[in-house]
Amino acid sequence: MKNNIEVSVIGAGMWGSTLAALLAKKGCSVRAWEHNPVMAAHLLDNRTHSALPGFRLPANVRVFTELEKAVVSPDLLLMAVDSRHVRALARAIRPLLEGKRLPHIVAVSKGIEAGSFLTVCEIMEAEIPRAKRRTMIMTGPSFAVELAAGAPTKAVLAGLDQAEVKKTIKMLEGGPLKLEPCEDRLGAELGGSLKNVYAVGSGII
């Protein structure tokens, strides 16, 4: 059932494709951007993802290699690219949002920028200043491959404005995905960024 929520997913990797599929199944109108034309063509032609066994991308997910076609007038924008590319993409997205209603922005990417030591949400806000109260992070002990397979998945959605967080949870969660609101955005981002470091360290010890 269509719900009139417009979604832009930036990055059609494992997390981007998984969340695009979940939101499309909820009835959202989903536009995904993928920089790799070969991957974009594969998703469009085959509706499968090489890293997600058994995954099917719903037919109502549109995939583009042109950013301006993926970011038209979204209610929800998901940033699901490698953290190294967040600043350049946020800078390119900013003019596409000018004069329009600001979407709820959710970072799925995790990482800290070299040199500035800014988190993904902080980078987004630096490049899109009016997004400060609407930029959130989704993080937790979760894996895209499990969510794509339909496994019950729980994560937190952390942001500075809890009213905005709760509105975004209503848009984003559904099916096997359950989200809990969180006020500590910085803590959530740092925890998500450092968890792999801790895992490697634990393995060495």
Predicted ranges, named:
Residues 1-56, 61-65, 92:
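NAD(P)+-binding Rossmann beta1-loop-alpha1 motif at the extreme N-terminus of oxidoreductases
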Residues 7, 30, 133-135, 179:
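Hydrophobic anchor at the start of a short beta-strand
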Residues 12, 35, 108-110, 160:
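Cofactor-binding loop segments of dinucleotide-utilizing enzymes, especially the Rossmann-like FAD-
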Residues 64-72, 76-79, 83-152:
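Rossmann-like NAD(P)(H) cofactor-binding subdomain of soluble oxidoreductases
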Residues 85, 96, 123, 127-133, ...:
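Internal alpha-helical scaffold of NAD(P)-dependent oxidoreductase catalytic cores
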